[in-house]
Amino acid sequence: MKSKFLLGSLIIISGILIESTSFSQSSGSNIWPNFRGVNCSGIASPKQNPPVNFSPEQNVIWKIALPEGHSSPCIWGDNIFITGFDGEGKLLKMFCIDRKKGAIRWEKKITVDNFEKVNPVSNPSTATPATDGERVYFYFSSYGLLCYDYKGELKWELPVPMPKSNHGMGTSPVVTGDLVILNCFGHQNDPRLLAINKHDGSIVWKYSLPKKDNYSGDSYSTPVIYKNQVIVYASEGVSGYDLKTGDRLWNFAIGVTDAICTPVLGKETMYTTTYSTRGNLDMRAQFPDFTEIIKKYDVNKDLKVDKTEVKDYQILVNPEMSDDSQKRTLAQVFGMWDSNKDNLIDSLEWNNMNLSFASFYEKQGIKAIRLGGQGDLSLNSILWGNPELVSHVSSPLYYNNHVYMIRDGGIISCFDSESGKLLFREKLGTTGAFFASPVAANGRIYIAARNGIVIVVGAGESLKIIAKNNMGDIISATPAIVDNKLYLRTAKTLYAFGEL
C-alpha cells in the first residue's frame, strides 16, 4: 500500500541497468558511493589494480583506529565516510577521513539513550553511508537518517522509528537522482519503503506492506536501481517500485524466512540468493515427532511444552559455523512455533511449523530472474536456479558473465550467468562465517571471511586461489576498491592497501 507525500520538485531519473544511478562505473576511479560500490554491484571501475598480497604489516599505505562498527567505507574523491559505535558512551559516530592521508577530517556524534536490540555478532553501526559527491547520508536504526555536507555541516535529519527485528537492521541507504531510498521493510512494527528528498529530508513517498497477523520475516537488504525503478528484496519476495510515484510494479514471490542479501543486476537479469535455515539437503533439521518431545520434556504432563521445559533442546541455526552465537535452543525461538501466543507449544503448532520449514527448504537457492515484466513474475520470469550450498549473509557477485556466491564454511560456487550451469563448487580453505560480500577488480575477486582471512581468487570457470591474507582480526564489513587501493575495515582498524 503506497502513501503519497508532497512532491517538492520534479524528479528526473535516467540511465539504464547498472548505470541507472546518478553516476556509473565509468564516472571515475575515485568513487565507491554506497554499500558495495556503484549500484551495490561489488565491481570496481575499469583498470583498477588493487594489491593481491597484504596484511597489517604488508602494503599498508595507512591505517587508522576506529570504534566498533560493521559499516563499509563510502568513498568520493579524497573523502571516506564511515560510522562507529561507542556502547559505553551511548554514542553513534560519523567520520570523514582523508583518503590519501588516513587522517580524520571531521567527526560527528549523536547520543542515543536506547539502542536497537541486535544479534550478538552485530552492533548498532551497520549501515554504510551513501553519498552523491556533495552530501553524505548516514542511517542508524537507533536514530534515523542524517545528512551532512562535505565540510561536516548538518543539513537535515529525519528521525525514523526504531525498528523491531530479529537481528537488528542491516540495510543501507542509496542515492538516485534527487532521492535517498531507505528500506524499512525489516521493521516488524511498521514495514515500509521510504523515498526521501535528498535536499531537505522530506518524505516524497512511502510504500507500506500490508499488516499481517503473523510475522513473516525481516529484510536486511539494500535497494538497487534498475532503469526508473528501485528493486527491494523483502520477506514477501523481490519487488520493483516506480521511483517517481512509489507504486509497486512487479513482485517475484520467494517466501523464505528473512531477506538478507542484496540482489545484483546483469544483462536485464537480477541475481539473488534466498537462504533458508539449514535448507541444504545435508543440513535439514530432522525434528522428532511431537510424542518424543512430550516424553522427554513435558514435565507437568499437560501434553504441551513451555519455554522452561525446552530450555535445553538445541536447534543449530548454522551447523557449518563454529561460532556459538549462531546456535539456538527451542526456548530462544519459541515464538516461531507458538502461533497462538499462549506461551505453550502443542502438537498442531509443532507439526505446522515443521511443515513451514519444509516449504522454506524448497524455496531456497540462488535465482536468476528476468527483468522488464509487470505484475506477478513468479511463474514465467525465473531463468534458472540452484538450491544447494546457498550463501547466507553475503550477497552474490555478477562479474564477467559469471555469478559467484560464498557459503558459510568457506565454499565458493560459480555459475554461467545465462544458462545457470554450475562451473565449479570448491572449498576456499578457510571456515566460519562470511558476512562481507565479495568484490571484484582486474579479473580478481576479493573474499573476506569473518575470521580475518581475505582470499583473492581469479575470476573464471575454475577456481584459482591467488593469495590468502591474514588480517588477524574479525572482518564483517565489505571492502571498497578505489584508485588502485583496497580499503578494508576490521573490528578495530580501517586499512588502505596499495602496492609499495
Predicted features and spans:
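Positively charged n-region of N-terminal signal peptides that target proteins for export
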Residues: 1-5
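Noncatalytic, solvent-exposed loop/strand surfaces
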Residues: 23-500
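Bacterial N-terminal signal peptides
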Residues: 8-19
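Intrinsically disordered, low-complexity Ser/Thr- and Pro-rich stretches
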Residues: 6-7, 396
